[in-house]
A protein has these predicted regions:
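GNAT-family acyltransferases
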Residues: 1-114, 129-130, 134-138, 143-150, ...
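Conserved acetyl-CoA pyrophosphate-binding loop and the N-cap/start of the following alpha-helix
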Residues: 114, 118-127
């Protein structure tokens, strides 16, 4: 399956993930303007810190995510609880994995009310097979800061281990706090 021709929708018991839409911007602004959620956002290698307070900023960001999907750079799903956007998940493949299959990077940004172990326990088993299979990645990296206790615990429950040493940005800059899941 080519995720850039047909983006998979992922449904769990309480959540749905689907390709981000422009109409999501208003709901996502509540996520990206949440000061309790902002410390958990991963902006490594990004042109923004994802801390938005105005709708035009969020619309511009969503437009960039959609453009990036259309050009095959990454998939950005909106995470919905019912009809309400409560976060996003992003996945892309880096072709510098040690086994030649590439390495995926998974970002998960959630409103602070959803930054809970039980939410990750629902998201990760649904997302990880797609990340490995549809992106062709032998391993998936995700960032989790030392203060993100429930996220860290959930990563451990779902087979993630701390990445050995620093991960390198595209320009070689070392970045820390990554966890790895192997297929």
């Amino acid at each position: 399956m080519n995720v850039y021709e047909s983006c998979p929708e992922i449904t769990t018991e309480h959540l749905m993930l689907r390709l981000v839409h422009r109409a999501d911007a208003g709901g996502l602004l509540k996520v990206y303007s949440d000061p309790k959620a902002q410390p958990f956002f991963n902006a490594d290698n990004c042109t923004s810190d994802f801390r938005y307070t105005r709708l035009p900023e969020m619309i511009e960001c969503v437009n960039m995510w959609m453009w990036s999907y259309e050009h095959g750079y990454f998939v950005r799903w909106t995470i919905l609880h019912g009809e309400t956007p409560v976060g996003t998940a992003e996945m892309f493949r880096r072709d510098d994995g040690p086994d030649g299959r590439g390495c995926g990077v998974l970002r998960i940004d959630l409103h602070s009310r959803y930054e809970r172990g039980r939410v990750f326990d629902e998201l990760l088993p649904a997302l990880l097979p797609c990340c490995h299979r549809d992106f062709g990645c032998a391993q998936v990296l995700t960032k989790a800061f030392s203060g993100s206790g429930e996220r860290l615990a959930a990563l451990g429950r779902h087979g993630f281990v701390p990445a050995p040493g620093a991960v390198r940005c595209h320009d070689g800059t070392p970045i820390l706090d990554y966890w790895v899941h192997r297929a």
